[in-house]
Curated annotation (Swiss-Prot):
UniProt subunit comment: Heterohexamer composed of two FlhC and four FlhD subunits. Each FlhC binds a FlhD dimer, forming a heterotrimer, and a hexamer assembles by dimerization of two heterotrimers.
Cell compartment(s), UniProt: Cytoplasm
GO cellular component, one term: cytoplasm
UniProt protein name: Flagellar transcriptional regulator FlhC
HAMAP family noted in UniProt: FhlC (MF_01891)
Disulfide bridge positions per record: none
InterPro entries the record matches: FlhC
Cofactor note: Binds 1 zinc ion per subunit.
Family: Belongs to the FlhC family.
Cofactor: Zn(2+)
Binding positions (Zn(2+)): 137, 140, 157, 160
Organism for this UniProt entry: Nitrosomonas eutropha (strain DSM 101675 / C91 / Nm57)
Length: 191
């Protein structure tokens, strides 16, 4: 009979709860904790109020190199690298702390959250397995993500070389229309 420590099981439940609250998928919970799948499903339902989503995890390193996802992914991986380099926080705890700081930055700057926790977890795995790597921009020297096997060496980040269609999303158009309407209202009230 296997002897289980109540304290260690409590820590695993606490970790799984934190991961669920951050939006981790069931597969991430299974890899990150020692709890059984059945207990994780029950915990997920208890925390979220719904069954965990089914299906495969997102698995495309190309997603991280698109303009907007690259900005958010680069921000996250730079936070993660800083935390792992200058603190004793490692593994899933480092991913959690980094993701919390990423979310805080997004909230403070009123930005749309592009990077989910599961994608952040996948990103760390891609960087650790050298599928993706961090390189410096030749213009601003900021660090950003690129494919590890890219032959080009003079990398320019998405902030220094913004694509022509950047920021032209439906959300940006709606925000622009809202701001224009607010200006019209202020001008009408000023008369």
């Amino acid at each position: 009979m296997k002897v289980k420590s109540i304290l260690s099981e409590g820590k695993q439940i606490q970790l799984a709860t934190e991961l669920v609250r951050l939006g981790a998928r069931l597969q991430v919970l299974e890899v990150s904790t020692t709890l059984s799948r059945e207990r994780l499903v029950k915990l997920y339902k208890e925390v979220k109020g719904v069954s965990p989503p089914k299906g495969m995890l997102p698995y495309s390193e190309d997603w991280f190199t698109g303009w907007q996802p690259n900005m958010h992914s680069s921000l996250f991986i730079n936070i993660y690298n800083y935390i792992t380099q200058y603190t004793n926080v490692r593994d899933i705890d480092a991913i959690i702390k980094s993701y919390q700081l990423y979310l805080e930055h997004i909230e403070v700057n009123h930005l749309q959250c592009i990077l989910s926790f599961t994608r952040a977890w996948t990103l760390v795995r891609f960087v650790e397995s050298k599928v993706l790597s961090v390189t410096s921009c030749v213009k601003c020297t900021g660090n950003f993500l690129v494919h590890s096997l890219d032959i080009q060496s003079n990398h320019v980040c998405g902030l220094c070389h913004v694509p022509s269609r950047a920021g032209k999303t439906k959300r940006a158009a709606a925000q622009k229309a809202k701001e224009a309407q607010e200006v019209e209202i202020r001008e009408a009230c000023a008369v």
